[in-house]
Amino acid sequence: MAAAILRFEDSRVTGPDSLRVSRLPAADKGGKWEICGICDGIEPAVFNRLKALLDAGKREEAWEGCLQYVLDNTAAARSWMGSDVHPATEFILRDHHFNSGSRNTGKILQRALNIHGAGLTVDGIVGPKTRQELQDQLGGTDEAVFLVGLQEKRKAFYRSCKQFPVFGKGWLSRSERAYQFACSLI
């Protein structure tokens, strides 16, 4: 999962040999530089450690560091699931979490659950009620059906962002690639 998320952040990266430091677009608020979505302006300590490894030629170690960072950074999404029985949903939640943060991921999740009558408050806080509803819905429906709603709410989230005119095409493309990857896990 983590490797796929890194590839969605930088499509030119396929593993340690192609791992690189890239300049962020001027409109990006994450800083000036990134390594597969790990930005100098958001996670400076992690970025600097990974960059130092790349500069020292320790590409394998840098790649492993990126993978571990993704897993650690998105662990909350995994905990919401309650088990590893639904890897496709876990993947979409982790990918969105890495790209848009915990609160925004919680909101798309709550909106997707509400499609099926959950009646949740959409506040982005994935508390006991949201977790139970997620587990109940996944236990009582086809995961592919749930993913359609989650994907719909993810795309709606991106379309609502102020920076959609600048980054929207890329966000929707990433979302579609992530959805296709998730479907392959079912």
Model-predicted regions and their roles:
Residues M1-I186:
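Cell-wall polysaccharide-cleaving catalytic domain and substrate-binding groove, primarily
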